[in-house]
A protein has these predicted regions:
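Contiguous alpha-helical segments
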Residues: 1-107
Length: 107
């Protein structure tokens, strides 16, 4: 097998592994809903790292070709939340000014 054929094969294998990880995350979102509000549309769901030390964003791990077991381990550190709830959680954790104003407005 030539060098170019070997490169193509490795590239195809890496892309197949990425696709398996993408499929795993898609199925995960399809079977989970937002921890805070119950939203279940997979298009608006994301991961919020709340336990342990964050290794990396899960999408970055998939892009970089990390294995499915690494990605599963990272997902275990997360809650599934919708983008709105993730934004609210992030603002609250950081003590952001926008969060304090919004909290007063909601009361």
């Amino acid at each position: 097998m030539g060098i170019l054929a070997d490169r193509k094969r490795r590239k195809a294998n890496k892309e197949a592994a990425r696709q398996r990880c993408r499929d795993y995350v898609a199925i995960y979102f399809a079977t989970h809903s937002c921890t805070d509000c119950g939203e279940s549309d997979p298009v608006v769901l994301t991961f919020d790292h709340v336990r342990g030390t964050k290794r990396a964003n899960i999408s970055d791990m998939i892009r970089d070709g990390l294995g499915i077991e690494s990605i599963k381990a990272e997902i275990e550190k997360c809650d599934v939340v919708c983008f709105n709830c993730h934004s609210l959680r992030t603002q609250e954790r950081s003590g952001a000014y926008r969060w304090r104003i919004g909290k007063v407005a909601r009361e």
